Amino acid sequence: MSRSFFATVLGLALAAMTVMAAPADAKSRIKDIVAFEGVRDNQLIGYGIVVGLNGSGDSLRNAPMTKQSLEAMLERQGVNVRDGNLNTKNTAAVMVTANLPPFSAAGARMDVTVSTLGDAKSLLGGTLLVTALQGADGQTYAVAQGSVQTGSVSAGGASGSSVTKGVPTAGRIAAGGIIEKETGFQMVSMDVLRMTLRNPDFTTSRRIADVINGRFPGCAQAQNPTIVAVRPPAGMDMISFVTAIENLEVEPDAPAKVIIDEVAGVIVMGDDVRISQVAIAQGNLTISVQENPAVSQPTPFSRGGQTVVVPQSAVSIEEEKGKKLLTLGGGASLKSLIGGLNALGVTPRDMISILQAIKASGALQAEIEVM
């Protein structure tokens, strides 16, 4: 990654954070930073069979579960194949998963995901047969069926070589699931509703309670950094109350944190990161070892002479010049840090090491989280 590109990225990041620092944009709606109790997806799972594959399905010899499932399915259709020798590669055993949205009504549709279990090469062109989807309680909440879309492309030549783009062993069926049973959650009958902060914080929790109490006195209580409990005022049901408070705006707070992805060389940090007085020096040391073997031959007409390879090594050590010492005063901001490191020509991967060293020295007033 070139330094000019790094400087451009840093400039855009600083510009974005400068805009975000405006008070009007710092506030968020309550419904964007909390999750309401009971308003969540429920995960469903089922076992099924995909048919219609063009020779890319399970080999029944290596996938006995597929053979057993196929025989059982055909017997339910009145076809007896127990005494026959099934030898098809057009079917595949799959797991079907889906998320049941909150407040879903019977008859509504949802997307489902299909993934192979056996040694099938691709689900491209296959059709999932009707499959029951169950929840963690073992009850059936939906059924799924339909054509599987993998989003992958495969091409092969006569020599046997092939190229595949995407993952052909997993796919989706858009609106392939039909909800048969509702979860039974009734928010309207609740007396107290708990809201869970997506990013737990004492200050944010208190601010949410204060904003709600400013509109509906005595109706909200911050129980901890994660939970804010609310109770609708007299004469108002829970649905109407939630509708009234979810659009109230709050300025969320969060502890200073630096997120580092060492594999990709990505660094993300907020504008509230502060650094105590510290001096930083960074330089690059390059060690180069080159092997230039030479051939040694005996003189003409000599006896007992042999041609041998003589190793010749060239070792050089080069230290990059021109680096200066960067000094940051106490309370230095993110802008000062990035500007100073950019002036030193520091790459993102070097910055990761520098930030970790600053944290180890006790000068970085933020938490470092390595992904």
Swiss-Prot record:
Q: Name one GO molecular function term.
A: structural molecule activity
Segment forming the signal sequence: 1-21
Cell compartments where the protein resides: Periplasm; Bacterial flagellum basal body
* Domain of life of the organism encoding this protein: Bacteria
Keywords from UniProt, A to Z, are: Bacterial flagellum, Periplasm, Signal
Its BP terms in the Gene Ontology are: bacterial-type flagellum-dependent cell motility
Give the record's GO CC terms. bacterial-type flagellum basal body, distal rod, P ring; outer membrane-bounded periplasmic space
Pfam families recorded? FlgI
Question: Its quaternary structure?
Answer: The basal body constitutes a major portion of the flagellar organelle and consists of four rings (L,P,S, and M) mounted on a central rod.
- Its job: Assembles around the rod to form the L-ring and probably protects the motor/basal body from shearing forces during rotation.
Family the UniProt entry places it in:
Belongs to the FlgI family.
Protein name (Swiss-Prot/TrEMBL):
Flagellar P-ring protein
Whose protein is this, by species? Caulobacter sp. (strain K31)
Classification from the root reads: Bacteria, Pseudomonadati, Pseudomonadota, Alphaproteobacteria, Caulobacterales
